[in-house]
Each structure stands twice: as C-alpha cells, then as structure tokens.
Design a protein with these regions (language model features):
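PLP-dependent aminotransferase-like
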Residues: 71-136, 140-161
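Phosphate-binding glycine-rich loop
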Residues: 30, 35-81, 95-99, 105, ...
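Conserved active-site segment immediately N-terminal to the catalytic lysine
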Residues: 159-194, 221-226
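Structural detector of well-ordered beta-strand residues that form the stable sheet scaffold
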Residues: 54, 83, 104, 157-158, ...
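Short beta-strand-to-turn element immediately C-terminal to the catalytic PLP-Schiff-base lysine
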Residues: 183-184, 198-203, 243
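N-terminal "arm"/small-domain region of PLP-dependent enzymes with the aminotransferase-like
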Residues: 1-30, 35, 309, 349
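PLP-dependent aminotransferase class I/II
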Residues: 8, 37-42, 47-54, 60, ...
C-alpha cells in the first residue's frame, strides 16, 4: 500500500536530530517561554522574511489572534466583513465568526482552486475591511492584482499560510506578503510538529505585541492582565523539533515539486483534470504541494479504484463550509464552483518520502482509469 502520508517516515528522515533536540529540552527543565521557542521564532521570522514571529497553540489560534488583535487595536469592529475563499478549510472561517466578524464567501477559480481574483471587487461593500487570502493546497494565491485591489479599497491583507510553508512569490515568501499571516504546524503539514503548534508572522510591531499578549492570557507582564486573552503558546518541545525540521524545509519541498512536476507532465487521462497545470508548467506561480489535488467527475469511483490497486488517497474536503451544520444559515447560498470542487477533488500522495517507483505506479494507474 502506498500511504497518502506516513508521519513515521517523514520524521525518520531527521529522527536523530529531533531526538537530540527534544532531549535537550527535557534536560533543561524549562518547557514554556524558553530558549527553544525564542530561537525558532527568530529563525522562522528570518525564513519567512518578517520582523516578528509569535508562536502559538495552533493555526486556528493564529488566525483568531490576528483578528482579535486588530479588534483590540480598533482597526476591526463587530460586524465588519472579511472576504474569504468559499472552498477553504473551515478553520479559516471559524477564526472570523469567533471574533464577531462577518465572512463573505468568494467563489474559487476552477483552474487554480484559489480565490477567483476576478470576483473580489464585486463582493466589496462599505463594511468590507479585510481579505483573508488562503494559500490552499500549498499554491501561492497572492497576485499583484489581489494586492492592488486591497490597496485600492483600503483592505487588510491577511494570509492563511497553514498549507504553504516555504512557498514564494518572486523573491518573497508567503507569510510576508500581507499585513499579517497565520501558520499551522499540524503534524501533516510541510513543516509539521508532533502535536499542535502555530505561529503569526508580521512586520507590524504594534500588532505583534498585541498578538503575543493575547496569546498569553492577555498579559505582557507577569500577573498583569491588560486584555481578556487566552492560553495559546508554542511549547519548548514543539519549537525545538520544528527548528530542526525548518533547516530541511526547502529541500523537502523541492522533492514534492519534483513529484508534482511528473504528475503534471505524465498524467494523461481525459477524465482527470489537473488544476494549475498550465500555470505551473509555464512557471507562472509557485507551489509547495502540501496537497496535490486532482478533479474527476467520477471521484468516488476513482478513489475506490486506486484503493483496490494499493494507493491511499484523501479528499480535501468532502463538505464545503457553507454546507456544514455549524453554518446552517448559509445553506441557501449559491456557490456552484465551490460545490463542484468539493464533489470532484481527490488528493494524491505527494511528499518527500515517496520513491520514483511509487510515483510511476500512481501515474500508470491514473492513466489506466476508465480505459479497461
């Protein structure tokens, strides 16, 4: 069986260094707000290209803290509208509604699966205050046109970089392109912890100070609480092992890109659509392929076929946010592109532990689907 993703294999690549780093933390007797966290925050800020990195508990907390910080600073207010891609993972939207803000769902582009920049302007009202730009599946969703629309309308540009660690736009990395960015280090991510972890990156000194305080119970001085905060901190063990894995992130992403490039060039089946193929092959965008999505009208049959042949796949995601019970009030929204993507999307194995032979098999099986 070709597993979709084996975390055991992923971590085995650097196991000795990880074990040594964790043992050092264990022996130190210091498990929060210590040197390992400070070191990782400094290294990750340098990697992303921002002045600040603030570690926190997970990616959802990172987004939630950004919106909350902007409210405390008087930039955002209850009921303000935040544009967000309709096909994102639900955490993006949870962070908005948790802060008393109003998500405005914008359809994606079927060719790229990212927010359709042609539709952004038509969704802007006098209550719109920000765009939450999600680099979904590892593909850079930022464009000069998106940035210009935000500038023209005075919108905050907030990045959800949970799936695109190391991705670039020109000579800058995602996570440094907007006013602030949220990062998730969930174990399955390209830069993954061994538990939950996240971070906020920004060049805004005031925002960084507020995010750090809000994630520490609302405190910037011990036992003095200026805000109603929460407990969302990056612990020393997660920080230490993330610092090890960060050194290899570009190398690991390069292997993902090599496999994805073969998928784009060698998968040839009229029943299967490869989103982003033209842009990738033309060098028009960067992608670190956290997920390699394909689209197929017979998605469920294709998934069963691959499973029978020994290839595990996943679906990202089977139910769109506006069809989830938690957002039942949106059930009447007409989002046909989003719903089509959620019906057709299938995620192929694509990671740095895969062999050429495994890649060969996946390509051969896909090219043979429906051609018996």
């Amino acid at each position: 069986m070709i597993e979709y993703l084996s975390l055991q294999k992923i971590n085995a690549l650097h196991e000795q260094e990880i074990v040594e780093a964790v043992e050092k933390v264990v022996r130190s007797g210091w498990y929060l707000h210590g040197q390992a966290t400070e070191r990782f925050e400094r290294h990750y800020a340098d990697f992303i290209g921002t002045r600040h990195c603030i570690g926190c508990g997970n990616g959802l907390d990172a987004l939630t803290l950004i919106f909350r910080a902007y409210k405390e600073l008087g930039v955002l207010h209850d009921g303000d509208e935040i544009l967000v891609p309709a096909n994102t993972f639900v955490a993006s939207i949870l962070s908005i509604t948790e802060n008393g803000l109003q998500p405005i769902l914008v359809e994606p582009d079927y060719e790229t699966l990212e927010i359709d920049e042609r539709l952004i302007e038509s969704h802007i009202t006098d209550r719109t205050r920000a765009l939450l730009l999600v680099h979904l599946y590892g593909r850079c969703a930022y464009t000069d046109e998106v940035a210009e629309q935000c500038r023209r309308h005075g919108l905050l540009l907030i990045e959800d970089n949970a799936q695109a660690h190391g991705c670039r736009y020109g000579n800058k990395r995602t996570g440094s392109l907007g006013n602030a960015a949220a990062h998730s280090f969930y174990p399955g991510k390209n830069l993954g912890a061994m538990g939950d972890a996240g971070a906020v990156t920004t060049n805004d000194d005031q925002l960084a100070q507020m995010v750090r305080a809000l994630g520490n119970y609302g405190s910037s001085r011990k036992y003095v609480f200026d805000y109603v905060g929460r407990n969302s901190r990056l612990d020393e063990i997660q920080a230490a092992l993330l610092d090890v894995k960060l050194k290899y992130l570009d190398e690991d992403n390069k292997r993902r890109q090599q496999i994805a490039d073969r998928f784009y060039r060698e998968i040839d089946n009229p029943r299967i659509t490869l989103p982003g193929k033209r842009r990738w092959l033309n060098g028009e965008e960067d992608n670190v392929f956290h997920i390699f999505p394909i689209l197929c009208a017979d998605r469920d049959a294709l998934q069963s076929y691959l499973k029978e042949k020994g290839v595990q796949t996943l679906i990202h995601y089977p139910i769109p946010p506006h069809r989830q019970r938690c957002y039942a009030e949106w059930g009447d929204l007409s989002l046909p592109v989003t719903e089509r993507i959620h019906r057709e999307e299938l995620s192929l194995p694509c990671n740095q532990t895969m062999s050429d032979n495994e890649t060969d098999l996946i390509i051969d099986l896909l090219n043979g689907f429906g051609r018996s």
